[in-house]
Every structure is written in structure tokens, then in C-alpha cells.
Design a protein with these regions (language model features):
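A short, terminal or domain-edge coil/loop segment
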Residues: 33-43, 64-73, 101-110, 130-144, ...
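Contiguous mid-protein beta-loop-alpha structural module that forms a pocket-lining wall or clamp
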Residues: 70-77, 81-176
Length: 269
């Protein structure tokens, strides 16, 4: 199967058994995990997992558990959506059992449930923005993984805190380089973070996802060693640049290595 030809959307919605029962679904999550992992080994199919906030019996704690479980599957995208109470939906038609508040106009998005307060839904919306920028975009995968591991944060806590900081900072429409600087400064302030290792992760992320080969100012370091490294790479037949192919080169100070990327093709998955 040609890589990128097929995208699978997997509607997990929740991993909370009480929620799954309330929405009249049956799900063997162990089986879902097995299938997702098997497909991932082929490296040719884009997998998109969906979670829905606002479902019955799903509070912030249990949604966090669903988020962490879904995130651990490592799909290319983890979509954090919000329940829409369309006409005919049980939570709309049975207000005694599901006393929810939702917007009067389409798409009738949930605003409050017996299990989630409006301010908690705001927390999740901010987390969604951070998740889109860092994970679903594919731009900061190594950065997020390093920061979570070093600071000892679960994915849910990490993205909730990052989203809240982004909302305070006003990152909604800022350019990528500015968001990179914001993310670096925010992660650098977390406990357990080594700034050199954090920069290493961000450099690898930026070089892997930006075919200009250019690093933003916040990651740029003036160092004569870089010029020498570029020269040595060019002189070695095994690492010499290909004619007409753009290359990005950087020094990694945490691991004391040189990293380079030749932009010959894009991962279609």
C-alpha cells in the first residue's frame, strides 16, 4: 500500500467504561490498541484518533485518563473534540437524565454538563490548541516528549498547562518562530529541564519539519564549530551534500553532536 494513500479515523471518544455504556457503545480497548500498533508498524497509514469532551459521566479526571491512554497509542493525530448536541441526541432529548447546557445556535456545542464546568471546558479548549500546535502539526514531537519525561508530567497535564500558558500569552495567531520561542521559554522553566537537551530536541524538531534548514533566532547559536562541521560533512563522501538539495545543519550541545538534514522528500504519512 503506497504510504499516505489511506487515512484511518478511529473514534475512540472515551476510555471510561461508564461513559462507553451511557452512549450505548461497545469497545474492547485492548483490541483497539493491538490494531493501532499493528497498523503503525507498517509506517504507511495515517491514523487519526478522536476523543470527545462533554460525554456523560466524563469529568476532568476521567477525560485526562482517556487522553493519556489515547496519546500513548502514538497515532499521527489525536483529535480533541467537543460534544455537539444535535437534534435527536440522547443528551439533548433526555434533559432529566442529562441536564446539559449547550449553545442555542449550530453546532450546538456543549457548554456545561453535570460532570464538567464551563471553566473546565475552557481548560480543555486551551489544551486542544496546544495539542494542535505541538503534536498534531508534527512540529514539536521530540520537544514535547523530552519536556514531559524530564519534568515528570503526563501528556494531559502537560498540554493543559501549556494551553493555559498559551492563552495567557496570546499565542493564538502568532508566527511559528514566535511560538517556538514561547514554547522554549515555557518548557525551560519546568522542573527537571536541561536547557541544552531542550534546545537539542527543538533543533531536531525544527530541522525535521522546516525545509528551509533555517533555525529561529531563539535557537540560533553563533559558534565557529558549526562552520567547521559543515566543511567536514562536505569533505566526507558519505555525508557530502547532494547537488541541488537544500541541507540544514546544527550543533547539538546537550549530546555534543552534529545533526544534518537533506530535504529530499517529505514523509507522506
Amino acid at each position: 500500500l503506497r504510504p499516505g494513500l489511506v487515512q484511518l479515523e478511529i473514534g475512540v471518544q472515551s476510555t471510561n467504561p461508564q461513559t462507553i455504556e451511557a452512549i450505548h457503545r461497545k469497545m474492547d480497548f485492548g483490541r483497539v490498541t493491538e490494531i493501532v500498533n499493528r497498523i503503525a508498524k507498517g509506517r504507511n497509514i495515517h491514523q487519526h484518533l478522536d476523543l470527545i469532551a462533554g460525554l456523560p459521566h466524563e469529568d476532568l479526571r476521567t477525560f485526562g485518563e482517556s487522553f493519556n491512554t489515547g496519546y500513548a497509542l502514538g497515532a499521527q493525530m489525536l483529535q480533541l473534540g467537543f460534544l455537539k448536541l444535535l437534534h435527536g441526541a440522547a443528551m439533548r432529548e433526555e434533559p432529566e437524565e442529562f441536564p446539559c447546557v449547550f449553545s442555542e445556535d449550530p453546532p450546538y456545542e456543549v457548554q456545561k454538563t453535570p460532570w464538567l464546568l464551563p471553566e473546565e471546558l475552557d481548560v480543555l479548549r486551551a489544551a486542544e490548541d496546544a495539542l494542535e500546535r505541538c503534536y498534531n502539526s508534527g512540529r514539536f514531537l521530540e520537544t514535547a516528549a523530552y519536556a514531559m519525561a524530564a519534568a515528570g508530567l503526563s501528556p494531559f497535564v502537560f498540554y493543559c498547562r501549556l494551553g493555559a500558558a498559551g492563552a495567557r500569552h496570546g499565542t493564538a495567531n502568532i508566527p511559528l518562530d514566535d511560538y517556538t520561542a514561547f514554547l522554549y521559554n515555557w518548557c525551560a522553566a519546568l522542573p527537571g529541564i536541561d536547557k541544552a537537551c531542550l534546545r537539542d530536541a527543538m533543533v531536531r524538531d525544527r530541522l525535521a519539519t522546516n525545509s528551509t534548514g533555517r533555525l529561529p533566532q531563539c535557537l540560533h547559536v553563533t559558534d565557529a564549530l558549526l562552520g567547521r562541521a559543515v566543511k567536514r560533512l562536505a569533505q566526507n563522501p558519505a555525508t557530502a551534500p547532494l547537488p541541488g538539495v537544500r541541507r540544514g545543519v546544527a550543533l547539538l550541545y546537550g549530546t555534543r553532536q552534529v545533526v544534518f538534514v537533506d530535504y529530499t522528500q517529505k514523509n507522506p504519512v
